């Protein structure tokens, strides 16, 4: 089967992606700086390699993609409030880390990069349902970072032929979610 890199693979969403890939027989390399993820989310398996590192650090992305066929890029600081408090730090993680990963993927001839984006790029538009043709209107550094990452991915497809897909997640919740997440209590609100 394939060798896949999952950035942010110790996080809430990433750890579930790793589980699914391993269950289907793929080998997985996880790169996570554990700033928002937890090592306890990572299953122990001979098919899983864990590397604790920051993608924005020089050389890390090149090492991360070495020998992989495709990438699921979930590493980020996924917090609007944190991006408002510390826009430089979140820009480094969400934009510079993504750009480094795309460049390294291009250089390593990775087949495809699938990356997480966010519905936050739509801003406060009341139009429903949301769709990809809508005009982005980011209202926070986090939303802008995700839009920039999408644009970088599209640019790498056009300029270099690197296959990229950006997925705009909406309020994801479930097992392994941090209890401190602003969405962790959403089910109780929906069922009340």
For each feature predicted by the language model, list its residue ranges.
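N-terminal Rossmann-like NAD(P)+-binding domain of SDR-like oxidoreductases, especially those catalyzing
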Residues: 1-172
